[in-house]
Regions:
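Terminal-appendage/accessory-domain detector
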Residues: 1-182
Length: 182
């Protein structure tokens, strides 16, 4: 995602994509070959990286069949080389760190490369909780807006942001906020 702006005009000039990660990621989500459905795609490191490079973000809809039909995704997946960094693997398992480190570098046909981009603790990791909460709140509100109009979206969102008011709301009243009116 961080490299999108830098490489978006050079997608066709990519020679290889070097991804360095930890053993658990390689074992669990590094997949080659055909991805048959959204569940396959959301458990594929290479698919997620390809979407991030192509779009600059990654949302739930990106795992659906209509997005997956883009031939550029598999072209990029085929150019990916996945390597293990032993330090990443060790720190992933260390209780005081639980690092989820990854690094990426893109190499082009003309011999140039991007800088290596390394993230040891991604947004959402407990060490980045303060940074992650606003991202999670935005994601929640954006997803509400997919289904509800602005008024209902704001009503649900604001209620959920006010713990005291939320705790005082009956389950029925809360559920009714989510009921689509005919």
């Amino acid at each position: 995602v961080k490299l999108h702006d830098q490489i978006k005009e050079k997608i066709d000039d990519i020679k290889s994509i070097e991804i360095t990660t930890h053993e658990s990621a390689i074992r669990i989500i590094s997949k080659v070959g055909e991805l048959n459905n959204p569940a396959d795609r959301d458990h594929c490191l290479q698919y997620m990286v390809a979407i991030g490079l192509l779009k600059g973000n990654l949302v739930a809809e990106d795992y659906e069949d209509d997005v997956a039909k883009d031939p550029r995704i598999d072209t990029l997946r085929e150019k990916m080389i996945i390597n293990e960094d032993k330090r990443y693997s060790k720190e992933y398992l260390e209780a005081d760190k639980r690092s989820i480190a990854n690094r990426i570098q893109i190499h082009f046909n003309d011999g140039t490369s991007t800088d290596e981009i390394e993230v040891e603790y991604p947004i959402g990791h407990k060490r980045r909780r303060e940074e992650g909460i606003p991202v999670l709140e935005k994601k929640f509100k954006d997803n509400l807006a997919i289904t509800f109009d602005e008024d209902i979206t704001n009503k649900i969102f604001n209620l959920c942001m006010n713990q005291k008011e939320l705790e005082e709301t009956s389950v029925i009243d809360f559920q009714n906020l989510f009921a689509k009116k005919p």
